[in-house]
Amino acid sequence: MSDQRAQEMIDLGNKLFAKKEPLNSLHQEIALQFYPVRATFTMSGDYLGRDHADHLNDSYPVLVRRELGNSISSTLRPRDQKWFLATSLDEDRDQDPDNARYLEYVSQTIRTAMYDVRAKFVRATKEGDHDFITFGQCVLSVEESPDRQHLYYRAHHLRDCAWLENNIGDVDHIHRKDRMSARTMKRSFKESALHQSVKDACKNDPGQEFNVRCVMMPSDEYDYTGPDAKTKGRKAPFIMCYVDADNGKMLAEIPSPDFIFVVPRWQTLPGLQYAVSPATSVALPDGRLAQTMALMIMEAGEKAIDPPTAADGDVFKEFNLQAGAMTWADLQGDRKISDVFQTIPINADMRTAFAMRADLREMLAKAFFIDKLNLPQVGPDMTATEVRARLEEHVRQLLPLFEPMEHEYNARLLDKTFFRLRAMNRFRTDIMPDTLSGADIAWGFRNPLQEASTRILVQQFREAIEVETGAANMGVGVMRTDLGIARDDAVRGIGVPAKWRRSNEDMEAEGQAKAKAAAIAKAAQEASAVAGIAQQAGDAAQSMRMGGLLPAPSKPGVEDEMTELPDEPEYVDFEDVAA
């Protein structure tokens, strides 16, 4: 039964790859013009050591594609910054300091795992970035290492992958071609699953390679008919099959809790599971023209520097114009060299050619969004409104470029990474706040695009302060803006770490303590003022007695001394006053 399933997987994959052949031809042409080292879609045989750019006359199309490909990592995944942050998709819940600290802990754990040198995340995403820019899509996988000590990221050649979408437009069924040596197959699969030819190769030629198909699909699609329908992989949503395509033998059937492949797609078209690159799709004619124009300019330059010549064949038997060379001429009579040899003047207008090339390169730069990558220049004389307008325009221009990359590319990579790390028990659940229990984890991003949006938020906060201050100076009622909330939004917007922020309870306790201290100080000030008034009154009465304006007080008798005891002193409890 397993061999029958193996043949079914091979036949299904063959159909998918046959339908994909025209796309491979297009990708080959695109790669020849913009990504020569990747121009292996229709090649067969050993291409190692080949000069991939021997057909090019102008390197500019390759350079602009390379610049855009490199900008993905530097813009969306800067290594020196925390470019992503876990979120629960609930702003009120995320604002809680305890929740924010745990989400920051999750983000740091993922970042540590991704940038582990053994995970090869940077290498895989660098390959994927250039495929994504050039061909509009790429294929990566997020796997556990065999010892389950770290993750392992891989990028796969688009030529070797074919996939299908489900009914909601997600890729959940993929066929991948691979070549494994007999030695690797023996180490990776059971001895009983290997074909006899593989076993013989292990003894005689361990380096002999065999064609292997890696097929991953939902479990409910795998063998959905027959007596064993939906029995394999029922405990897991997906199943991975390894098939010996040369011998039609099933090597392994491995249930999987998730779909390990990530297939980011830049611009999709209705009814197609494959995407296109909006950059190379419009730049391909200009790329071809750039090569033709470069050849034309080189020929014109050669003619201008080393123009063609004309000579009398009867005079010159053998013509040699090399430096220091001698040419024998049979001159008869009074004939001169200038009479039998002359240079054909070529008046090439190179300025026109250079202007045409500059215009072509400008179009290529626009096709690859090079003119929109840098932040707008802000002058010292610009007003806040002008700065804000430029930043908003910059964000609008970059959205078509980077928005699909964040959602289709980075977010899906983070989802797979989070799922794998959770399966490896890399997250501490004992410190998770109860309010985050059962919450879905999503991702927010920090990059120049988000930085531009953050600058807009901070600018709005500053403008609000200016408006409220001006209104207060003019005596216009109560302040409309809640500056506390606005300040908190601005602080979160500029990316202040969660561990810097104080909890609401701490801030409330400090506020109460400050209010109590202020009340005590006020009560003490009032008591001091009362004592001062009493002292002034006593001094005034004494002065009036000395001046004869008031009679001197009579001396009390013994009985008065016994009966007229001094009043008990009055004590002021400042805490009661403050309360």
What label would you give each PLM region?
Residues 14-17, 143-324:
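Structured, contiguous alpha/beta core segments that scaffold functional sites
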Residues 1-26, 34-35, 39, 308-579:
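C-terminal anchoring/interaction modules
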Residues 135, 209, 436-438:
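A general secondary-structure signal for short beta-strands and their flanking turns/coil
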Residues 119, 133, 137, 149-159, ...:
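Flexible, active-site-adjacent loop/turn segments at secondary-structure boundaries
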Residues 3-11, 38-55, 66-79, 96-101, ...:
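Charged, low-complexity, helix/coiled-coil-prone segments
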Residues 1-205, 579:
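Extended, helix-rich architectural segments
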Residues 67-75, 123-132, 212, 284-288, ...:
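Generic hydrophobic, helix-prone segments enriched in Leu/Val/Ile
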